[in-house]
């Protein structure tokens, strides 16, 4: 297959990353996509004009990320002579506010100008507003500061024609798991077959009798989706998925340091954690995903689950999004009158019982 043919099969989604200069856009991009750690982003310089990144995510889903410099001269250019070029065919706008900004009113004017241009050329796009650097706000003031900023932003969005469900707000900081949480929501919105994936994971979780399954993208360690069963739904650690993302990133950095390779190139076959109350393993599911499995504290069930996940790999191969394959799966599901992926996982179940 030629490069041109391959590119046509890739599903490209244009994502704008915008905000005033110094808001933290490039820092978060470097942490999520370039495997930086928080303490290292201080040496990053300001973004000049637009930095384009084509990021392959889960196979043929290509994120066309535009990191737009926030200096006034660049913003003026985006809104005037580059207006149609920048704001056309946008799937997602991620706008970053610095909660500690001394020019909050000016920031809001810039935001209003931005979404006005977005509504002109991409009125159906989704807006994720990241209220960033929340670590700089005293603990007792965080909720109030977030509520006030969200109210101001939502009012502006409604004035410019964006309905409530088109806009999401997330408080973020590079120093905790909140950054992974916010970007996970962005990725979940962009993945076109998330419901298909969840249906298949639910069947697999039932087969394994797993407490929880979490699907991670291998390069970024972002959560794609998860399935939680039974009492695990009452787990008080609501940020546990993002904590695992952070642990995986740290583990990759440690491996890179000891092997002399780049963190983005590091991979591992499997990681296991065993306690008296539960057992956990994370392993490759497809070329571009890892699956974390939380099991009861039973060695036999744990080992059976590891085998069954290996058997499941072939059935989950179409998660590495190929449009033609995805459409065929959906067409077959419509013909059968069942949810996409159900018959696939039933096959896994039969194999597991035979084993």
Language model features with spans:
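Short hydrophobic alpha-helical segments used for membrane anchoring or interfacial signaling
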Residues: 213-219
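Glycine-rich phosphate-binding P-loop
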Residues: 14-34
């Amino acid at each position: 297959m030629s490069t041109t043919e391959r590119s046509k099969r890739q599903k490209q989604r244009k994502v704008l990353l915008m905000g005033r200069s110094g808001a933290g856009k490039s820092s978060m991009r470097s942490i999520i996509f370039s495997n930086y750690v928080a303490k290292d982003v201080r040496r990053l310089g300001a973004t000049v004009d637009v930095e384009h990144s084509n990021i392959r995510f889960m196979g043929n889903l290509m994120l066309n990320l535009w990191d737009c410099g926030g200096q006034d001269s660049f913003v003026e250019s985006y809104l005037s002579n580059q207006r149609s070029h920048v704001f056309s065919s946008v799937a997602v706008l991620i706008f970053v506010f610095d909660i500690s900004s001394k020019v909050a009113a000016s920031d809001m004017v810039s935001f209003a100008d931005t979404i006005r241009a977005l509504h002109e050329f991409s009125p159906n796009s989704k807006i994720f507003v990241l209220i960033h650097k929340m670590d700089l706000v005293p603990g007792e003031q965080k909720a109030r500061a977030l509520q006030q900023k969200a109210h101001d932003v939502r009012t502006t969005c409604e004035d410019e024609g964006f309905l409530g469900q088109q806009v999401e707000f997330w408080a973020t900081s590079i120093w905790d798991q909140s950054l992974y949480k916010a970007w996970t929501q962005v990725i979940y919105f962009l993945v076109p077959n998330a419901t298909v994936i969840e249906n298949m994971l639910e069947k697999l979780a039932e087969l394994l009798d797993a407490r929880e399954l979490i699907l991670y993208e291998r390069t970024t360690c972002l959560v794609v989706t998860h399935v939680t069963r039974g009492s695990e739904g009452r787990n008080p650690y609501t940020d546990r998925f993002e904590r695992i993302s952070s642990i995986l990133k740290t583990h990759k950095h440690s491996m890179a340091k000891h092997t002399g390779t780049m963190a983005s190139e590091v991979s591992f076959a499997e990681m296991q954690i065993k306690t008296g109350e539960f057992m956990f393993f994370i392993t490759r599911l497809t070329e571009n995903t890892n699956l974390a499995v939380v099991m009861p504290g039973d060695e036999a069930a744990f080992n059976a689950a590891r085998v069954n996940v290996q058997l499941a790999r072939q059935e989950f191969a179409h998660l590495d999004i190929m449009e033609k394959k995805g459409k065929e799966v959906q067409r077959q599901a419509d013909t059968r009158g069942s949810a996409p992926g159900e018959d696939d996982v039933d096959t896994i179940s039969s194999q597991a019982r035979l084993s």
